[in-house]
Amino acid sequence: MIIVAHVLLILLGATEILQADLLPDEKISLLPPVNFTIKVTGLAQVLLQWKPNPDQEQRNVNLEYQVKINAPKEDDYETRITESKCVTILHKGFSASVRTILQNDHSLLASSWASAELHAPPGSPGTSIVNLTCTTNTTEDNYSRLRSYQVSLHCTWLVGTDAPEDTQYFLYYRYGSWTEECQEYSKDTLGRNIACWFPRTFILSKGRDWLAVLVNGSSKHSAIRPFDQLFALHAIDQINPPLNVTAEIEGTRLSIQWEKPVSAFPIHCFDYEVKIHNTRNGYLQIEKLMTNAFISIIDDLSKYDVQVRAAVSSMCREAGLWSEWSQPIYVGNDEHKPLREWFVIVIMATICFILLILSLICKICHLWIKLFPPIPAPKSNIKDLFVTTNYEKAGSSETEIEVICYIEKPGVETLEDSVF
């Protein structure tokens, strides 16, 4: 046990000595890097380089560097190497700083800053272009065996408010290590370039690098300040509409199918929106899907137009633009009744309405009884008159007595006697 205790004490002592050697001396003095430079290596791209201070005291420690971007947009990060690439706009100038740091779990030691700067290019800010917008679009490449798809680039801008009339602008783009100048421009009424078209580029439709665009200019009267801008491809990529959209109606079921757009992305990388418009009542239905088929229950007595659009799903890249709607497809029956049939229906309805009004008037004013009085029923009592006339002449011709006799059956009205 005594031997074991001695061994443990020896190991513990060795561990403490080793930790003491590894811990940085808080009294160590850190010196800033030297020869800090900023070099433009491409459109909207700079290389920061520096060297360790040769007077820095060497210890068994790992020194790091903290880089701070001051302009045009603040940022900071740490690195262990002595150079750093930075993609940023440069028309406003660029400045950065770097310092030596040494950190552990308890504290951070840092040197003073070493700084460098790129000044803004010459020219009045009002001479540079404004409202630069760019879009990309993917098409099938039938001319290259290396790439199945080709990306085009289209950019537009407005002339600077203080730019002289003889100003001419020129556009360049950089993607990765490729830089290209525009050859196809559109011009305004003064002949100044205001748009550019690249039918074929080195841009990768599935790429994630920044697209850098620079527009500079020239004039005989003043210096034109250049303008550069960075674009994320997912934010400017104009997706093509879906292909081969079909729609069929079976009873009250509307079945819609389509194919994925022309794109380097596979079929599972798309979201879709289906728009179904009832042309009779104006009802609009929009459904979002992840498949290339949709079934809807509809009114089979109406006519519909169907359209579909697409967007790259967030599963494959950051959310971007929706495509344009596909060309409308019309399905269904929207035949109207013939004019003659409608005319007959209207006439019959009018006649029924008039008769109803007349009937109400007659009922209210008792005209019906006055116009068409009821016919009395024939009586059931029949009078049988039996008349017997007896002439009796009593001797004398001067006096004549006429007697009329009758027999009345039960229920027969009594007639008055007439004596002549």
From Swiss-Prot:
Residues 21-342 are extracellular. Cell surface receptor that plays an important role in the survival, differentiation, and chemotaxis of eosinophils. Acts by forming a heterodimeric receptor with CSF2RB subunit and subsequently binding to interleukin-5. In unstimulated conditions, interacts constitutively with JAK2. Heterodimeric receptor activation leads to JAK2 stimulation and subsequent activation of the JAK-STAT pathway. This is Interleukin-5 receptor subunit alpha. Residues 32-123, 241-334 form the Fibronectin type-III domain. The chain crosses the membrane at residues 343-362. Keywords: Disulfide bond, Glycoprotein, Membrane, Receptor, Repeat, Signal, Transmembrane, Transmembrane helix. GO terms for cellular component: external side of plasma membrane; extracellular space; membrane; plasma membrane; receptor complex. The WSXWS motif appears to be necessary for proper protein folding and thereby efficient intracellular transport and cell-surface receptor binding. Pfam families: IL6Ra-bind.
